[in-house]
Amino acid sequence: MNIPLGEKVMLDIVAMFRQYSGDDGRMDMPGLVNLMKENFPNFLSGCEKSDMDYLSNALEKKDDNKDKKVNYSEFLSLLGDITIDHHKIMHGVAPCSGGSQ
């Protein structure tokens, strides 16, 4: 069966989240750190954000219910931020500069 690219990307995102989340379907800080370092090393190094403070802040910002874990919806919000930053870079904005596009 030929899976269209968009569907494959979505299925891969779901699988990535499940790989790093716990049995409760949520991801704690160690899981988020591992996921980011293993799957987004260029983003982290390009933004010079590979330190724990950035990841702690990302978890805190996206943790809407303040349970110190990221559910799937919160995780998608984080991925949205990363995707927006990559889009800005494609339009000549410096990585993580906060510029608009």
Swiss-Prot record:
Zn(2+) binds at H87, H91. It comes from the Eukaryota. GO terms for molecular function: calcium ion binding; calcium-dependent protein binding. InterPro entries: EF-hand-dom_pair, EF_Hand_1_Ca_BS, EF_hand_dom. Residues 13-48, 50-85 form the EF-hand domain. One of its GO terms (cellular component) is cytoplasm. Keywords: Calcium, Metal-binding, Repeat, Zinc. GO terms for biological process: endothelial cell migration. SUPFAM superfamilies: EF-hand. Ca(2+) binds at D63, N65, D67, K69, E74. Gene3D superfamilies: EF-hand (1.10.238.10). The keyword Zinc applies. PROSITE patterns: EF_HAND_1, EF_HAND_2. PANTHER family: PROTEIN S100-A7-LIKE 2, S100 CALCIUM-BINDING PROTEIN. Belongs to the S-100 family. This is Protein S100-A7-like 2. It comes from Homo sapiens (Human). The gene is S100A7L2.
